[in-house]
Amino acid sequence: MEMNNYLSEFIMFYCQNSVETAKNYRRANKDFIEFTMNRQGWSMDELVVKANKRDVLYYIKELESRDISPYSINFYISAIGTFFRFLIEFEYRSSSNPCENVQRLDTDGIEQKQEYLEEYEYKALLQVIKTREGRQRKFEFTSSRDVLWCTLCLTVGLRAFEALNLKVEQFNSDIITIKGKGNKTRSFRITDEIREAFNEYMKVRNTVLIEGQEDEGFVFISVTGKQLHTKDINKNLKKYTSRANISKDISSHALRRSCVTHYLDSGVPIAKVAVLVGHSSTSVTQRYYKSTGEDFDFLGI
C-alpha cells in the first residue's frame, strides 16, 4: 500500500475532529516516512513492519540538524507514535510502537516566547490592515477578511481551526455555537464589533468566487474561493505587524493569548474567561496570562 493510503486512513480515524491537527500529523509523519525510507532504502510496506526505535532516534537527529525547536520535535515524536499506534490497532503492524520508549527532549530552562498584543498594538495592527493606497478588489477582500479574523480571535479567543470552520449561515443568529478542542461545544455572543466586521467582509466575500464555482459556505476563504488555511492568515499577520512596526512574532494563537490577557487585566473573572475561550480548567487559562496592568474596555464585554 502507498504512503498516502496509510496516512489517509490514519487521518480518517484519528484526526477527524480538527483540520489543523490532521494537517500537522500528516506533515510530521510524511516527513518521517520519506526520511526513513530514503535512509533505509525501504518501501512503505517495509517501513510499516520494520521501523524501530533506532529509526526514530535517527530522525530526531535529523530534526535537530534543521534547528527545529525541542517543543516541535516532541510534537513530531508524539505524532509518529500516534501513527504507529494506528498501524498496530489496525493490524498493519505486529511489533511494538517504535516511539514507546523514546525519551522526549528536555524543554526545562528553554523559554518559549508567549507573544501577545498591547491595546495600542492591536489598534495599530487593525489600522494597517484597513489602510492602503490604491485599494484594489483583491485587497478589499483580504483586508475585510483579516479584520474579521483579528476581531474574532481577540474578542472571543477563537482557536484558528474554530474560526476556519465557521459557516456564513451561523451569523444569522446573535449567538454562535462552535465545536472546539476535544469535540466540546461552546457558544459566544456576536458583539457589535464582530457584526460590523462581518457585514463589511460580506460586501466583498463573494467577489473572489468564479462563476459556477461551488460556495462551501465557510466564512473564511482564500482569494481562490476555497477554505482558508492557518498558514495563509499567519503569513499575512507577519506582514501586517511588520508594517505596523510591531517587533513581535504574532500569529493567530498570539491573538487568542491577547484575548485572555486583556480580559483578565480588565478584571473579568478567570472562570468566565476560561469558559469563553474553551479551556478545560482555569489553570490552563492562567498559563496564557501575562499581566499588562492595562484595560481593554473597547472589546465590549
Residue ranges and their predicted role:
Residues 1-301:
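Conserved catalytic core of the tyrosine transesterase superfamily
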